[in-house]
Every structure is written in C-alpha cells, then in structure tokens.
C-alpha cells in the first residue's frame, strides 16, 4: 500500500472507529428496534472509496 498521508490515516482511523456493533444498551433502550449497524464493513469484502 505504500506510505500513508496523515489525512488518509485519519480517515482510516475514523472508519475503524465507526466499524463497531450497536451497543447492547441501545438495543435494550429501543426494545430491539435497533439491532444492527448498516455501516458495518469487512476489511476484505468492502471498499472504503479511498
């Protein structure tokens, strides 16, 4: 991949933070109306449009 610029590292770090499941307390609070995160991404299958 080569050298990453600071801006690119920042974007990748944000994408990594966003790539988490919905917290259990959110599921409980919404009575299981919110159970999945539509922005979940797999590093091998999905692209980030970098």
Curated annotation (Swiss-Prot):
Q: List, in alphabetical order, the GO biological process terms annotated in this UniProt record.
A: translation
Q: Which GO cellular component terms, listed alphabetically, does the Swiss-Prot or TrEMBL entry include?
A: cytosolic large ribosomal subunit
Q: Where is this region: Disordered?
A: 1-22
Q: Which UniProt keywords apply?
A: Ribonucleoprotein, Ribosomal protein
> Record keywords: Ribosomal protein included?
yes
Concerning Pfam families, the annotation shows: Ribosomal_L39
List the HAMAP family hit by this protein, alphabetically.
Ribosomal_eL39
Task: Please give the family membership noted in the entry.
Answer: Belongs to the eukaryotic ribosomal protein eL39 family.
**Name used for this protein in its record:** Large ribosomal subunit protein eL39
Task: Tell me the organism.
Answer: Halorubrum lacusprofundi (strain ATCC 49239 / DSM 5036 / JCM 8891 / ACAM 34)
This protein's encoding gene: rpl39e
